[in-house]
Amino acid sequence: GFPIKCALIAEGGERDAALSHLVDDLNVADVRIKYVPRAQLDALSSHGAHQGIALEVGNFPYADVADILDRAGDGPALVVVLDHVTDDGNFGAIVRSAEVVGAAGVIIANKRAAGVTVGSYKTSAGAVMHLPIAQVPNIARALDDLKAAGFWVGGASEHAEGSCWDAPFEGRVALVMGSEGDGISRLVLEKCDFLTKLPQRGMTESLNVAQATTALCFEWLRRNAGELMGEE
């Protein structure tokens, strides 16, 4: 998780039993502790919802693609690849869905893309702490690494001829989702082994990228449930 740089504790908090135990744990972990006026914590938090403590944390420890491949092992695996998704809320929701279905990890661009922030942490319901997330300088090159590890690369596109019900989602799949406005970029699209889309009957143009990713992740899980979950 996030490395803790410093703990800010409300003055007088050491007399609170729960906080006292927490202070002991922080001391064991060799975390620096500062006692500050409660008003300072009020100013740092939302509506004073701090329970007498706030943590100053360092940068999120992103994983490497190699870490995701190690987690994927040799059997069926899903890696979600985001081609410059920019909204923190969408990113957090995608990570939550990917973690719920047991994906091996999420790969994102290191520039012009949403990453792990306080907002995306909340939207993910903490899932960012349980799933490797790799930042890479080149999405297309990361897909080459996944292909070399036996992954079949599928891109979500409204221009796909067939729906996800017919897509080759069995086994090792890298699911590529494009940005909210532009979709998958040309260079990344060229790396895709197949394109897929969600079937729909209504009048609304489409789902947003987070909703679409969730649906496709669960379709992958359904296809591989027999091997992954012991279902017939």
Residue ranges and their predicted role:
Residues 1-70, 232:
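N-terminal positively charged helical leader segments and presequences
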Residues 37, 83, 109-110, 131, ...:
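Short beta->alpha connector loops at strand-helix junctions that form conserved
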Residues 104-162:
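Histidine/lysine/aspartate-rich catalytic loop segments that bind and position anionic ligands
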Residues 100, 122-127, 186-232:
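Structured adenosyl-cofactor binding patch, chiefly the S-adenosyl-L-methionine
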Residues 76-125:
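Hydrophobic, well-structured mid-protein blocks that either form specific transmembrane helices
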Residues 86-94, 138, 207-211:
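Amphipathic alpha-helical repeat scaffolds
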Residues 154-208:
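Active-site/ligand-binding-proximal alpha/beta "capping" segment
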